């Protein structure tokens, strides 16, 4: 593989969807943002995803059309094998990944994987979760506990407390630094 798979992770409310949406607006000739296949309605949530029924999801998984897949929060998530074609063509591919399923991504993509974990201060995370209005107070507290408890090992961290523009710039800098390092090996 000549491209890098950027596995972007972070707790709910950390700003992954906003970061990806902003990144899609910028011209990137060698960076593609992959859509996830999810068993939820297309209009649910803020993520730009491809909605599948469970039957459609299992059919695709059974036909080996998903490079990676997992179950979380009562839904099935997957990333299509098209990302492998993009990587082999030399593109870097950014995926909205799962912290719990990072080992699966590491096993498949090994040295081509660039894991990045968004970090957000508890105060900012609480504010974002409250503002989006999807969870009640006890669910927000549970998400805050889960966010504080789990940060994957051996990941690059990206603080997302600041402006969206600043976070995208920092993400792109991190990706390009890793490309230069990879090219020098």
Curated annotation (Swiss-Prot):
Name the Gene3D superfamilies for this protein.
Answer: P-loop containing nucleotide triphosphate hydrolases
| Pathway entry | Metabolic intermediate biosynthesis; 5-phospho-alpha-D-ribose 1-diphosphate biosynthesis; 5-phospho-alpha-D-ribose 1-diphosphate from D-ribose 5-phosphate (route II): step 3/3
Reactions mediated catalytically: alpha-D-ribose 1,5-bisphosphate + ATP = 5-phospho-alpha-D-ribose 1-diphosphate + ADP
The residues the record assigns to binding ATP are 10-17
GO BP, one annotated term: organic phosphonate metabolic process
Give the signal peptide as a residue range, or say none if absent. none
Which residue ranges run through the membrane? Answer: none
Q: What is this protein called?
A: Ribose 1,5-bisphosphate phosphokinase PhnN
